[in-house]
Structures are given as C-alpha cells and as structure tokens.
Amino acid sequence: MKTERARGCEENYMKSESTAILLRIFIGESDHYKGKPLYMYIVEMLKAEGIAGATVFRGIAGFGKHSRIHTTSILRLSTDMPILIEVSDLEENIERIRPKLDEVINQGLITEEKVKIVFYDSDKNK
C-alpha cells in the first residue's frame, strides 16, 4: 500500500493506494434468502465478515438470461428489477467470502476484476 501526505494544503489528509478486487453481483430484486431480500442478506453478511465496503444499486431497466426486459416504466410495472451489489476489498478477503456467496445465490452473475483503490482520508470534518 502506498501512502502520502498532501502538501501545501491547510487540511491534513492522507491519500493511500492499493490493489484490490471488485466483485459485481447481479441478482433480481425479488430474490430472497431466509425470508429477507437477498441483497440485504448479502450486505449484512459482508459487513459481519468485515469486508471493506459494499454498495447496492437498483437498476431502472435491464434484461438477463431469459431476455425479458424489466423496467420501472409505469406502463410495465416490474417487481423484479435488476440489483447490482458492488463489493471491493483485498483479494484474500474476497476469496474468503466467495464460498458464502455460492451458498446463497441460486440465480445471478458475479464478475470479478482487479482494481486500483485510491482512498482519501481527511480530518477537516472531525
């Protein structure tokens, strides 16, 4: 991990860079596991496992394996919008949680890629 302190600024902030893995998990909004929406179950599981971060996005339109278009259009109310969960952390942490994802995802898609993380941390709001 590379870390540097900003120069010439009144605020004291740190910038650090590292290599990580970005997982993109594509599931449906109607997917559930143990009585709760699958996306919430996954986010709660990731947090409990100490994963660095995860964000859930709800798509406004999309199609998948069955080529059915899902949209938020008033004329075509869909109860199964596409859900994307982005997860980023160190490779060893992602590898550790992969089997847990395999257990809970019955239908969907996961993509994985190496990414460079640039993290900024400032004490100006503290």
Task: Outline where the language-model segments fall.
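Positively charged, small/polar-rich N-terminal and surface patches that mediate targeting and assembly
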Residues: 2-126
